[in-house]
Regions:
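S-adenosyl-L-methionine
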Residues: 226-256
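Conserved class I S-adenosyl-L-methionine
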Residues: 187-198
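Conserved beta-strand signature within the Rossmann-like core of class I S-adenosyl-L-methionine
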Residues: 288-296
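Class I SAM-dependent methyltransferase Rossmann-like catalytic core
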Residues: 148-183
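N-terminal auxiliary segments of SAM/dcSAM-dependent transferases
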Residues: 48-147
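A short SAM/SAH-binding and catalytic strip from SAM-dependent methyltransferases
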Residues: 260-274
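Conserved SAM-binding loop of SAM-dependent methyltransferases across substrates and taxa
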Residues: 199-213
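C-terminal lobe and adjacent flexible extensions of AdoMet/dcAdoMet transferase-like proteins
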Residues: 361-495
């Protein structure tokens, strides 16, 4: 009698293998379950070879058909395709945190975009009628975003959008993913849904942030002409980054299964009911997954993102704000204006932006069509209760921003999240801060620089700070509270 392992081992089929021509031009139907079963067995024994599996499948399909089937099933099976065409168990460790600080938009992606531009307009795409048309599309996109108008994407608008936004969107997503990776909460092999994927900047940033040995099942939802650009840009990704583009609206698309990351990058402001859409996709989130929402730093889109966050994650609800705007007091949610954004180092100007900018009108400033500032608002939401920093206020120790009115002119101790870079235009540094209970804006104003209060300046966006002996004042001109950090104030970064 054979042992259990032998009983489960693959069996060779009797029929001969289909010829090359038949398999490549008219691929036979393949027993997908048999491919999966054989792969599950072999993965524990040796590298999974499509040539070998083909011998075990009824009808002996061509190895190329088996390989394609394995690629389609690789994420579910936890298999990584090697350069030699065989498949091995994927590394299941979380994605490591990266020192993400890109200096430039990668050349391979720049060349891919320029290929599209040359294919549509010719080698001199940036001059003449085509250049004028692209510049007009960029002007209109910027105006529509500023005014909050509906944004329409034809082929010219999609390419103009790609020229202007691919680099900064590429950079921004990596910084946001670091919030998850630093706590080992970013899967190395995620299933990703990119809602409103646009022309692919966030997808490419995600691709480059994850390690080379990751196995990714990436799905994009993009109904506009931007999907054509997205398709071309995704062609630059590695073989284990499997991509599918769904040309449907966010409202119409029906998620299939669960996703580890649901990404909304610069799309919430374009939806009629963004909170309802986010709620819909929260239902498709894995139990330990994250919704990652990113928006441009301008006032309207930034505040709009925070409004969505607050609507889908009310105080004591089932959705937790993981970062950056932590709620430090249980039972409270903020209701201030909510304009808050991070600032990272600028990118080098890519050649395609420089060329488009050189053809600007005489009355336009240099750099009108250059966009290398990396400034963005974001929100990471989870349903498992995880937070980037598990810090909460103690009423016996700290004042609460919800009750700041009664502390005016007093020195207090305060626990707060740093929610901006230096906003000052004068001598005193100014930083937006919050504790998740605030109804109006609060700002830390550093009037005296000391070693003991340096953390207010040195801390990163999203860090939690303890302020000791900070002076609370009301700023009537700004309609906000100023927390004065002077030589009597101690500021410590909690984490």
């Amino acid at each position: 009698m054979k042992g259990d392992a032998d009983a489960d081992a693959p069996r060779r089929a009797d029929s001969s293998r289909a010829g090359d021509g038949d398999s490549l031009h008219s691929p036979p139907m393949i027993d997908r379950d048999a491919v999966r079963d054989n792969a599950k067995y072999l993965r524990n024994v040796r590298p999974v070879d499509p040539d070998e599996i083909a011998d075990y499948i009824e009808g002996a399909p061509h190895p190329a058909v088996v390989k394609q089937t394995l690629r389609e099933e690789a994420h579910d099976l936890g298999l990584f395709e090697r350069d030699d065409g065989t498949f091995v168990p994927a590394n299941a460790d979380p994605a490591p945190v990266r020192n993400w600080s890109p200096a430039a938009f990668p050349d391979d992606y720049s060349f891919a975009l320029e290929d599209l531009l040359i294919g549509r307009y010719g080698a001199n795409w940036h001059v003449g009628e085509s250049g004028d048309r692209l510049r007009e599309r960029v002007r209109q996109l910027k105006e529509d975003y500023y005014r909050g108008n509906p944004v329409e994407y034809d082929e010219d608008a999609a390419l103009g959008y790609a020229i202007y936004h691919l680099p900064d969107y590429y950079a921004a997503v990596g910084y946001v993913l670091s919030d998850l990776a630093e706590r080992s909460l970013l899967p190395r092999n995620p299933r990703v849904l990119d809602v409103g994927a646009g022309t692919g900047g966030p997808a490419l940033g995600l691709h480059d942030y994850l390690p080379d040995d990751s196995v990714v099942d990436y799905h994009a939802v993009e109904p506009s002409a931007s999907a054509d650009v997205l398709d071309r840009m995704l062609g630059e990704t590695r073989r284990n980054f499997r991509t599918t583009v769904h040309r449907e609206t966010a409202e119409a698309f029906a998620p299939d299964g669960e996703y580890d990351i649901v990404l909304f990058a610069s799309v919430l402001s374009e939806l009629d009911d963004p909170a309802a859409v986010v709620r819909k996709y929260l239902d498709a989130l894995a139990a330990d997954g994250a919704v990652v929402a990113i928006a441009p730093a301008d006032r309207n889109t930034s505040i709009g993102l925070r409004e969505v966050e607050r609507e889908v994650a009310p105080a004591d609800g089932d959705v937790t704000v993981y970062s950056p705007a932590l709620r430090l007091w249980d039972g409270y949610a903020p209701s201030d204006r909510g304009w808050s954004f991070d600032v990272r180092p600028d990118l080098d100007v890519p050649g395609f932006q420089r060329r488009l900018d050189e053809g600007r009108a005489g009355d336009e400033d240099e750099g009108t069509f250059v966009n290398v500032d990396v400034q963005y608002s974001y929100s990471v939401l989870r349903t498992d209760g995880e937070r980037r920093l598990d810090v909460r206020g103690n009423p016996a120790r700290f004042a609460k921003m919800a009750e700041m009115e009664r502390h005016v002119t007093n020195r207090i101790d305060l626990l707060a999240v740093k929610l901006s870079h230096d906003l000052s235009e004068g001598n005193n540094q100014v930083f937006k801060i919050g504790d998740g209970s605030e109804a109006v804006d609060h700002y830390a104003v550093r009037t005296r620089d000391t070693v003991l209060n340096a953390d207010v300046a040195d801390a990163d966006y999203g860090d939690v700070l303890v302020f000791e002996n900070v002076l609370s004042l009301w700023n009537d001109d700004e309609g906000a509270y100023n927390l004065v950090v002077d030589d009597e104030t101690l500021v410590d970064r909690v984490a």
